């Protein structure tokens, strides 16, 4: 789990600036409370292909994604959504890891509020 959290936060570049040791530790503490059965069961959701369902989404959608996401790289995930979903707005957070609500909260909140005002 240490490796996942390090990648989740891009700890190699953001530790001590946008990610505190306390934030990392809080995530660790939460992760170790998960049941082993639940951890194994969730893996199936990562491998399910939902692409055929995307054109059926008929509500406006906001997708926020960090361009430095090492868990789910932008080019392989969110950048593919425009054209597959009718009304999708993709906001790319520069320098953002997978954990953008923690590391780039101001930008995430601004994007959310702008989207809700539409």
What is each residue range found by the language model?
Residues 67-70, 95-97:
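Acidic beta-to-alpha connecting loop that harbors the catalytic carboxylate
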Residues 70-76:
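Conserved alpha/beta-hydrolase "acid-adjacent" motif
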């Amino acid at each position: 789990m240490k490796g996942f959290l390090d990648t989740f936060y891009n700890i190699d570049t953001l530790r001590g600036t946008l990610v505190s040791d306390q934030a990392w530790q809080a995530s660790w503490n939460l992760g170790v409370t998960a049941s082993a059965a639940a951890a194994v069961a969730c893996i199936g959701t990562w491998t399910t292909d939902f692409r055929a369902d995307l054109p059926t989404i008929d509500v406006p959608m906001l997708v926020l994604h960090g361009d430095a996401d090492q868990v789910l790289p932008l080019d392989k995930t969110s950048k593919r959504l425009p054209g597959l979903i009718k009304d999708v707005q993709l906001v790319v957070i520069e320098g953002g890891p997978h954990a953008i609500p923690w590391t780039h909260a101001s930008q995430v909140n601004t994007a959310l509020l702008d989207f809700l005002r539409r």
